Amino acid sequence: LLDGGMGTMLQAAGLKLGARPEELNITDPALIESIHARYAAAGSRIINANTFGASAHKLAGSEYTLEEIIAAGIANCKRACAPYGALAALDVGPLGELLEPNGTLAFEDAVAEYGRIVRAGVAAGADLVFFETFTDLYELKAALLAAKENCDLPILASMSFEAGGRTFTGCTVESFAVTARGLGANAVGINCSLGPKEIFPMAKRLAEALP
């Protein structure tokens, strides 16, 4: 059982619009740890560290380095997990830049950036890596390749689909399932965008694509 959203909890706690949630790992660790602990106490066995937006692009202008933010995020998460025996996941989202040819980010640069993120998570003591809310299968491929090159931790991969059963960039459930597992993901899933009613048929297709 995984945890729930961090962003919504931080908004309820008064996070200002435009603020970087990941910086709270350093500026207000008690708040972050308390949110993790609430999820763990409710029965979550995998807790995602507050590192979803920890990429060079999204942290541009921050006074903290990517490595500092990830180290603090994993530390907060592990402290909250310890009393409950839960696992601390390095939570990784899209980089915030479109890959070529739709954007300007080269595939090799994306692999390098994800490698930096994964190495920081490993150094901080993450128990696993969770790539989530991806809409571009090409970017997820870069992330998974980087993870396999830089760690031997379990890897979870999840994409966000629209009501028609495809991601924003046109990826189908089946293409995602086969590609992600082929690149070493230990588990695959669907998150964000839709509710349980809409996701359930897609989840069935996901399972059927991986006999």
Where are these regions (language model features)?
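Domain-level signal for soluble alpha/beta catalytic cores
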Residues: 1-211
